[in-house]
Amino acid sequence: MVAAGSAALLIAGCGTGTTNHNGTSTPSPSTAASTPAPAGMPGMPGMNEPMPAGKGLSASESGFTLVPGTTTIPANTPTSFTFRITGPDGAPVTQFVPEQTQLLHFYLVRADLTGFAHLHPSMAADGTWTAPLPAMAPGNWRAYTQFTARHPSDVTVPLVLSTPLTVPGAATVQPIPAPSNTANVDGYTVTLSGQPAAGQDSPLTFAFSLDGQPVTDLQPYLDTYAHVTAIRVANLAFAHLHPQNPVNGDHGGPTLTVEAHFPDSGDWRLFVQFQTGGIVHTAEMTLTVG
């Protein structure tokens, strides 16, 4: 089953902003309501992506390490966050393979899943990345980096690395919405069908409607018609969902199928980002994986 809300899961999307469980935007990182679509760069379609290694809960995997410039972020004010990805030789990695139009996808998730942001940082020549963070509410957060790096042996390695972040101040923890198969955002309704099982590839289908009518004008967003991110409620593990629908101009919808692989059972929070009229919308729901 899935839970109602107005933020999102992970297939292929990006943006900045934050939404709470009531579907309203808050001054913390998440693109829940609506966000102008960012400019992209040529890359590989999401449906060709290999599955990243691990569950996204470690800063190191396969010899690569996420090295943050800091793990403490000031509350309620936009700031910049710098980090590097080091390789097996300990040197900063500067060679990445584009994935869904970007060299690296950066996610911010608050521990109670009320804050979410999908950002695309820039990389300097020395391998230092800079992400412009929106204002973040006090509390515990986790930053995820999703990328495909080139190993010194010229092998490509898809990875999700993460690190915990702390935003000082009085934090209010919100309960996770109960599972439901619909979510509403900006007048749109997103309905999910499918029964995923842990450890197996499971197709999930999202149906998009506006005022009760099927949506057929979804625009390409990061080389696909939607971007879905899944975060496990119990431990903030990360799951990657792959879009199956080919892109055919501004005519996406009314349904979109993704290939989901959830490593563990339990409740997962989904963040579904899709674009219409040049605006990225983020729908959020809770899904129970058996």
Where are these regions (language model features)?
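Bacterial signal peptide processing site
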Residues: C14-T18
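Extracytoplasmic low-complexity, Pro/Thr/Ser/Ala/Gly-rich segments
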Residues: G23-L104, T182
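Transition segment at domain starts
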Residues: P45-F64, G69, V160-G199
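Beta-strand-rich structural segments
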Residues: P78-A91, T145, D201-Q213
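Aromatic sugar-binding surface patches on proteins
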Residues: G115, A124-T130, N248-T257
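Residue-level recognition of secondary-structure-to-loop junctions
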Residues: M123, W129-A137, F262-P263, F274
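Surface-exposed interaction/gating patches
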Residues: V173-H240, P254-F271, T276, H281
